[in-house]
Amino acid sequence: MWQPEQRYFVFNPHYADEITEEVLDDFFRDPFFVGFKLLASYWLVPYDDPRYTRVWEYAEKHRLPILMHTWGREAEPFRTIAPKYPHAKFILGHTGGSDAGRQLSLELALLAPNIYLDYCAAFCSTLPWYQLAGKIDRSRLLFGSDAGPHNEAYELGGFLSMPVPDAELAPILAENFDRILAERI
């Protein structure tokens, strides 16, 4: 189960040479770190850059989640990356953000069962996020709030206000992510 004292290891590809597998082992030995977070657009290094390979391989080996900031067409490389690493859990943060990004995220999730969609910033697209629930397995939908940059009450209120039965929303709030964490090795 996700605990408040757990966080993602933020992998910056500009330091890929220094972040060896041994360094990752040292970090992930501590239960504080539960997966990776990547922000390709912040670092101006696209996800298909080979400097991310260590993340894909390490997450595959240890069945870790990888939360990626995705916006617009930014997630396109996962069309080929995700199938190569079936035990890694690729979480498309913001479900692509824009309308085009949301459509691409859904398309990618339909192609690869290890791609998950994150609710955070659902207000950035005119395409209703709840409609995803009818198109992919709900166990691959995750609630996220971007705690800090976004108002968590607003994000949660928007999520709970969707015209979806509570019994279908509840697992998205925590159970689905808890299942991902339970699979780590």
For the regions a language model picked out, list residue spans one by one.
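Mid-domain alpha/beta scaffold segments of enzyme catalytic cores
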Residues: 1-44, 50, 54, 58, ...
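Secondary-structure boundary/capping residues
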Residues: 4-7, 90, 141, 168
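Short, solvent-exposed loop/turn segments at secondary-structure junctions
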Residues: 12-16, 40-43, 73-74, 97-98, ...
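Catalytic pocket-lining loop regions of alpha/beta-barrel enzymes
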Residues: 34-35, 45-142
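Mid-to-C-terminal alpha-helical segments outside catalytic/metal-binding sites
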Residues: 138-140, 149, 153-185
